[in-house]
Every structure is written in C-alpha cells, then in structure tokens.
C-alpha cells in the first residue's frame, strides 16, 4: 500500500500508521476503525475529556484511569484500548483527533476511497451524514468516507475539505465576507 508522505510525517500520522499496521496484521482494521470512531465522537462531545487529554495538571495515571473507565462504556476493542492507554502513558492523548483522522485516511487509501473532513457547529445526524455521503459520492464518482468533527465557532453551516479543496459554507465565513463587503 502506498502511504502518503505528508500523513506519515506528522506525529499523529506516525502513531496512526503504527496502529494501522498492527490492526492490519491482526485483521482488525474495521474493528479498530469503529472503536476509534466511538472514542473520537466522545472526545469531540465531552469537553472534560478534551481538557483531561490536553491538561498537564493531571498525572498520566489519572488520564489512564479515565480511559480505562471509558473503554467498557464505549465498547472499545482490546487493541484500541491498549493504544489509547499508550497515548495516555506517553502524554499524547491530546493528539487523538489527528491520529484518528490519519488512521481513517490509511483505511481509505487501502480501499481507494476519498475522505471528506466535514466540520459543523453541531453533530450531524445519521440521516444528514448519509445524505452528505451520497451527494459527495455522486459528485466525486468515488466512494467517500466522512470524517465529521464539531466546531461551535463556525456558528452554523459546514466546511467540507477534500484533499486540497475546501468548501466553506459556514455562517462564520459568510459573516466575515459580509463584514469585508461593508467595509468597502
């Protein structure tokens, strides 16, 4: 498999590649992807988890205990649980969103899929995700995997990134353009 050099060069990319290679060796690529998705969703929605992951005040042991408590609740597989514990032990849990995104990209590359990073102010419903996936698939004439993240600062709408292309339909962007137009 051809691995993108830019993904591999980043810290998150290196961790993701290591996890991907082990998952591939054990035949657990999809299982790990599903577990990463569950944890990624929890990470995006739980402010406390993000603070814990990015805060140097808490000891790594406290972070590891929090991960251990989340694993059964989120039904995360053993390989991913060990990986999350490794990230916590190394103080790298704050890089999890980048790692999860890179892992999804490796899976997509393996399957010759396109990955669309979608940023919204609020979580997308399953229906919205499937509608967006269908429209992107129609436009790109390729299978598409959506990497949805939530960023309340965009206020509404969405930003879609596909490789080097970006479509910014966020309210924040529209307000910025309106403000620029009013300045003259």
Curated annotation (Swiss-Prot):
Database matches in Pfam families: OSCP
GO terms assigned for molecular function: proton-transporting ATP synthase activity, rotational mechanism
InterPro entries in the cross-refs: ATP_synth_OSCP/delta_N_sf, ATPase_OSCP/d_CS, ATPase_OSCP/dsu
Disulfide bonds listed in the record: none
Alphabetical list of NCBIfam families matching this protein: ATP_synt_delta, PRK05758.3-2
Family: Belongs to the ATPase delta chain family.
Protein name in UniProt: ATP synthase subunit delta
Organism of provenance: Zymomonas mobilis subsp. mobilis (strain ATCC 31821 / ZM4 / CP4)
């Amino acid at each position: 498999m051809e691995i993108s050099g830019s993904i591999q060069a980043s810290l998150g990319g290196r961790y993701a590649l290591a996890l991907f290679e082990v998952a591939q060796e054990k035949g657990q690529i999809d299982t790990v992807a599903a577990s990463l998705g569950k944890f990624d969703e929890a990470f995006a929605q739980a402010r406390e988890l993000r603070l814990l992951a990015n805060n140097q005040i808490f000891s790594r042991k406290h972070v590891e205990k929090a991960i251990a408590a989340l694993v059964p609740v989120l039904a995360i597989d053993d390989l991913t649980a060990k990986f999350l514990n490794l990230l916590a032990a190394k103080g790298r849990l704050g890089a999890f969103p980048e790692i999860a995104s890179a892992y999804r990209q490796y899976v997509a590359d393996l399957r010759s899929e396109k990955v669309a990073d979608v940023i919204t102010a609020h979580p997308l419903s399953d229906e919205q995700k499937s509608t967006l996936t269908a429209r992107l698939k129609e436009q790109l004439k390729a299978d598409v995997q959506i990497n949805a993240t939530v960023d309340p600062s965009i206020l509404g709408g969405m930003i879609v990134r596909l490789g080097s292309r970006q479509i910014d339909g966020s309210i924040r962007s529209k307000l910025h353009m309106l403000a620029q137009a009013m300045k003259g």
